Structure formats: structure tokens, C-alpha cells
Design a protein with these regions (language model features):
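Hydrophobic beta-strand segment of the Class I
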Residues: 107-108, 112
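A short His-aromatic
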Residues: 115-116, 120
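Short glycine-centered segments of the SAM/dcSAM-binding site in methyltransferase folds
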Residues: 134-137
Length: 211
């Protein structure tokens, strides 16, 4: 249904290089330790509520970078996995050849999609849904990154407004109407909006045309 473009692998090569060698920023500085922050930690409370609602046990951390959500701790020294109530989190990071995709109750995808070439967004979204048994939880950055690709371009290659991402999610969710999805969009490091939890089946079951 969806085909990946040649740019997908080219970008993956760039991110693999950056993970190994670091990257330049747009302010002229150079960063050696890269993509090791556990982005879902900032959303611990939201994830905890969703896990409790679905009684979820497992999660796939899609685009996990260099972090491991099974061991990383919150500021109070409690493990993230214990706080949110999950039993096992499977990391998957193709830029580091880390982990394998595994169908889980929940799929987490935080600060990943903005790094994907625009043609390949539908393919990746479909991949997220196909690996979820209950819910897909996404945060996407809607602003330019400080990081630069090795070719000098901005590392956030697909920057679009929140409503655009909402439309993408709604379209792909028609293929998986029983899967819930939650969307967060960030327009800055401290400026995050929650666009709610949705499920296409609820719209199909409604007696209203206007949704």
C-alpha cells in the first residue's frame, strides 16, 4: 500500500553516522553524545493514565535512540517502567541496529516522526499501528531542530503544524479502526499540546456524519 522512498535509507544512514560520531548544531557547537535522552519520561503521567486504562503490560519503544526505558529512572529514583505500570518495554532503534519490532499492547513513538522524510510518514505510521494491540502514543516536534544532518540540512526534515499530524493520524487509523491513538505535538521543548485519545471505530459507531 505504501512504499518507502530512497530517502528513507539515506536518512537512516545519516542518523546512524550521527549516533556514532556526533553532530553539529546550528549555533556552531558540536555534540558528541547524541539521541540518548528518554523522551517518554516527560510524558510519564500521561502514559501512566493510558496504561492503567487499558491495563497494558507491554510496550514497543519505536525509535528509542540510545535509552532503555526498562532501566531508566525518574527524578525520584523510581524506575519509569514501574511508575507507568508496564511489565516489559522493547526498544527498537534502526539507526543503532538495536532491538526488533514486536507487537505489543502499546507502541510509544516520541520525537521520531519529524526525522522521517515526508513521503515515508504514512508507511511509518502504518508500521506503528500494525505493531499495537491497544494504543499508539505519539509525540512529534513541530519546530526546527538545533541538530544538523551531516549534509548541513536540519535534522527535523518534516516540520508541519499539529493539525497536519492530526490529519495523518486520522487517515492511517482508518486501516486500524479498533486501535486507539494518542497524539502530543510540541512547538518547543516546553510547549506541548495534547490532542486527545481517539479511535476510528468510535466514529464509525456514531450516528452522526459530522465528526
Amino acid at each position: 500500500m505504501f512504499n518507502l522512498s530512497p530517502q528513507y535509507d539515506k536518512l537512516l544512514d545519516h542518523y546512524s553516522y550521527m549516533a556514532k560520531n556526533g553532530y553539529h548544531r546550528n549555533d556552531g557547537n558540536f555534540v558528541e553524545k547524541v539521541y540518548s535522552d528518554a523522551e517518554p519520561l516527560k510524558f510519564s503521567d500521561n502514559i501512566k493514565k493510558i496504561v492503567e486504562f487499558f491495563k497494558s503490560k507491554s510496550a514497543l519503544d519505536y525509535g528509542s535512540g540510545g535509552s532503555n526505558l526498562n532501566t531508566i529512572k525518574l527524578s525520584d529514583e523510581e524506575k519509569f517502567i514501574d511508575y507507568v505500570g508496564l511489565k516489559k518495554i522493547y526498544p527498537f532503534e534502526p539507526a543503532r541496529n538495536k532491538g526488533k519490532k514486536k507487537k505489543c499492547d502499546i507502541v510509544l513513538c516520541f520525537d521520531v516522526l519529524e526525522h522521517i522524510f515526508i513521503n515515508d510518514i504514512p508507511w511509518v505510521l502504518k508500521d506503528l499501528f500494525s505493531n499495537a494491540k491497544q494504543c499508539v502514543i505519539i509525540n512529534v516536534a513541530c519546530y526546527k531542530a538545533a541538530a544538523l544532518l551531516p549534509n548541513g540540512e536540519n535534522a527535523h526534515v518534516t516540520v508541519r503544524p499539529p493539525i497536519w499530524w492530526l490529519g495523518q493520524m486520522e487517515c492511517i487509523s482508518t486501516l486500524y479502526p479498533e486501535i486507539y491513538w494518542a497524539l502530543f505535538t510540541s512547538q518547543g521543548h516546553q510547549n506541548t499540546n495534547f490532542l486527545g485519545v481517539h479511535r476510528m471505530q468510535d466514529k464509525l459507531d456514531s450516528n452522526k456524519f459530522v465528526q
